[in-house]
Amino acid sequence: MYVIGRSFKFANQFENIDLNMVYVVASFHDLAHHIDKDNHEVLSANLFYLNEKMKEFFTYEQRGIIKDAIEDHRASLDHEPRSIYGKIISSADRNVDIISSLKRTHAYTIKHYPELDLNEMINRAYNHISEKFGDCGYAKVWLVDEEFDKFKNDVKELLKDKYTFGIKYMEVNNIIDTKEKKKIKTL
């Protein structure tokens, strides 16, 4: 619902936007994430494009635009989205909350890197958030987004001090062991 709501917020900034297309792009954009995280945008776009019901509602041209928009939503996309619908979904899909970023990064780390100790988890989270949302981060928005701008400023502030970052990471993820807190001073 988060991405759908943000998509409508962005869509309302423009005239002649088909809100049905916006809704479908937002609804399908991560549909295949559970199948293959690394290629989910292509798989999700294909699930949409091959869906017989969608062929009843949208023209061939509209379906092509929707497919392209779904493919273009990734934060790591190396080019500008091909349509306004791609810019809307790509911008809407950006996280604007530091707490959820820290929680998502922690959950991903625990699942995919269970061997890491606390310092390594914090370092991984620090590096990931810096690479994605820092000054030269790859996550972009293609439309005016004051929420994302504020989020980027919050991230910039948090990344200034690794120790403060580590404390915040632990607080957000309910890591309260005081022995562990002492360990992060070595970061």
Features from the language model and the residues they span:
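Divalent metal-dependent phosphate-bond-processing catalytic cores, especially two-metal-ion Mg2+/Mn2+ enzymes
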Residues: M1-N16, F28, L77-L187
